[in-house]
């Protein structure tokens, strides 16, 4: 049983799925044109038609497959989805006299979708078309000053629509509205971490049988959690390989070992730093660095696979957003290969096991909590596959990495100490190749400049630079130049994404 979300191109479609899951209902995203047969495979108890950039009156406007609107389940249309419901039922949709973008107050609201909601209702609008004539059987259930039809319902056919985005945080009571839709659908709201873990373990055991599984551990939350889940499901038939390429943060290898081994993960750690740093010698171009690191990882991983094999399966931490991004027109997914293991030779062509392919990142973090993964790893900020190589601008050397590791450790430890870490989506230190004149005591210095960066974001597609307190930044600068003598200048990056990327390389 699920709620199927048909995606017509809205940037917020994933948020709809996440909000419904947070409310305890399993939800699945399919292309807006998914066939009736494909939708039926999900056994839907409700359907959501997402927003999108198209206009329903255009000849090439996307539309659900024939028969979808005839299904005997409640349907909620959001923005474009509402306009489509109205248009298909005989109503009129036209270019709005005044476009609405941003927050708007509902001047009135009611009906089944708004049951139990009281007080001011702020909604996030983003539309240039409006329903100008209601189809037969529908009633207006919401309006704003500029949009007289901001919500519609037909309680007989159980068709509902809103001309705003209930899934975004800018619609504070949107969660209550979505919960009301789930009540209308009669969905069993039993989708929770405990339920997920039990199902995943059974699925793994069923798929793997008596086979052996190989997993690459990066030290991040996804692969670490996957290691714990697989260890619980199949025990020592899992071999997890952690490649230390010398580009990790200070103490990271020891932290991963201390977190996973006591919890039963059969973990193999490999020090391949000499190979990686040797291959990176003299290389300054960031794209070249990435390619070299990817190549060396494959070599090291292949060597360990042959050493501890044979294996029947390769486990990957593919997440649901990866599946959505690579889905074809009928929802068939060609899953992206994990950046670390996508180039293995054909004779190591394992079958894939991807237990997290239907999960979002926040669901994986909750599973990690249940499985006992320490918060230091579970709530860790994202860390790039190439590691510190792309935060050490220019050529990568052991000496420069040692400097960067100490700067990064001071910054990240400081964020935790001051209670600022969890308020940032990602924080990092960069060692620049810039050297400048300074004064330490009575002596002239000519040392490196370190850059600190912290951002806040919901999706990492765009990001704001974090407004960290001046006192904190002053403290970090003071600690860094006093404890890392190779640094005599610290700068803070105040550039958003765009125009910059989060990482410097």
From Swiss-Prot:
InterPro entries: Class_I_gatase-like, GATASE, GMP_synth_C, GMP_synth_GATase, GMP_synthase, GMPS_ATP_PPase_dom, NAD/GMP_synthase, Rossmann-like_a/b/a_fold. One of its GO terms (molecular function) is ATP binding. ATP binds at residues 218-224. The active site is at 79 (nucleophile), 165, 167. It holds the Pfam family GMP_synt_C. SUPFAM superfamilies: Adenine nucleotide alpha hydrolases-like (SSF52402), Class I glutamine amidotransferase-like (SSF52317), GMP synthetase C-terminal dimerisation domain (SSF54810). One of its GO terms (cellular component) is cytosol. It catalyses: XMP + L-glutamine + ATP + H2O = GMP + L-glutamate + AMP + diphosphate + 2 H(+). Gene3D superfamilies: 3.30.300.10, 3.40.50.880, HUPs. It is an enzyme of class 6 (ligase). Pathway: Purine metabolism; GMP biosynthesis; GMP from XMP (L-Gln route): step 1/1. Residues 2-190 form the Glutamine amidotransferase type-1 domain. Signal peptide: none annotated. Its EC number is 6.3.5.2. Residues 191-380 form the GMPS ATP-PPase domain. Keywords: ATP-binding, Glutamine amidotransferase, GMP biosynthesis, Ligase, Nucleotide-binding, Purine biosynthesis. Catalyzes the synthesis of GMP from XMP. Homodimer. This is GMP synthase [glutamine-hydrolyzing]. It comes from Deinococcus geothermalis (strain DSM 11300 / CIP 105573 / AG-3a). The gene is guaA.
């Amino acid at each position: 049983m699920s709620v199927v979300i048909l995606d017509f191109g809205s940037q917020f479609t994933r948020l709809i799925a996440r909000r419904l899951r947070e409310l305890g209902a399993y939800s699945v995203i399919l292309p807006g044109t998914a066939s009736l047969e494909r939708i039926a495979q999900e056994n839907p108890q409700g359907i959501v038609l997402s927003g999108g950039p198209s206009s329903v009156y255009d000849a090439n406007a996307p539309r659900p497959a024939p028969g979808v609107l005839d299904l005997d389940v409640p349907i909620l249309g959001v923005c474009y989805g509402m306009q489509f419901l109205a248009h298909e039922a005989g109503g009129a949709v036209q270019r709005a006299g005044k476009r609405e973008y941003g927050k708007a107050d509902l001047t009135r609201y009611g009906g089944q979708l708004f049951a139990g909601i009281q007080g001011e209702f702020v909604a996030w609008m983003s539309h240039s078309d409006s329903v100008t004539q209601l189809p037969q059987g529908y009633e207006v259930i919401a309006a704003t000053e500029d949009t007289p039809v901001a919500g519609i319902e037909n309680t007989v056919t159980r068709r509902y629509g809103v001309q705003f985005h209930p899934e975004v945080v800018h619609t504070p009571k949107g969660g209550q509205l979505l919960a009301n839709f789930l009540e209308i659908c009669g969905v069993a709201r039993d989708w929770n971490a405990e339920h997920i873990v039990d199902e995943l373990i059974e699925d793994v055991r069923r798929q793997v049988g008596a086979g052996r599984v190989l997993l690459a551990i990066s030290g991040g939350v996804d692969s670490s959690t996957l290691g714990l889940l697989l260890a619980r499901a199949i025990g020592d038939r899992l071999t997890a390989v952690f490649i230390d390429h010398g580009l990790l943060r200070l103490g990271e290898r020891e932290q991963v070992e201390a977190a996973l081994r006591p919890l039963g993960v059969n973990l193999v750690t490999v020090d391949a730093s000499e190979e990686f740093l040797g291959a990176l010698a003299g290389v300054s171009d960031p794209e070249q660095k990435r390619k070299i690191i990817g190549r060396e990882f494959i070599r090291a991983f292949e060597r360990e696979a042959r050493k501890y094999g044979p294996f029947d399966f390769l486990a990957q931490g593919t997440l649901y957003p990866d599946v959505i991004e690579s889905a074809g027109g009928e929802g068939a997914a060609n899953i992206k290969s994990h950046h670390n293991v996508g180039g293995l030779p054909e004779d190591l062509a394992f079958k894939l096991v991807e237990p997290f392919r239907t999960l979002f990142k926040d669901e994986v973090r909750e599973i990690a909590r249940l499985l006992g993964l320490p918060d230091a790893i579970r709530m860790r900020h994202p860390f790039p596959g190439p590691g510190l190589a792309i935060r050490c601008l220019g050529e990568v050397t052991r000496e420069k990495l040692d400097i960067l590791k100490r700067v990064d450790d001071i910054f990240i430890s400081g964020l935790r100490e001051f209670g600022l870490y969890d308020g940032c989506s990602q924080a990092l230190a960069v060692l620049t190749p810039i050297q400048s004149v300074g004064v330490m005591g009575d002596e002239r210095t000519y040392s490196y400049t370190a850059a600190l960066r912290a951002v806040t974001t919901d999706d990492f597609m765009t990001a704001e630079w974090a407004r960290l307190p001046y006192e904190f930044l002053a403290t970090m600068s003071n600690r860094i130049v006093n404890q890392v003598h190779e640094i005599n200048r610290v700068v803070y990056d105040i550039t958003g994404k765009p125009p910059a990327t989060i990482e410097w390389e």
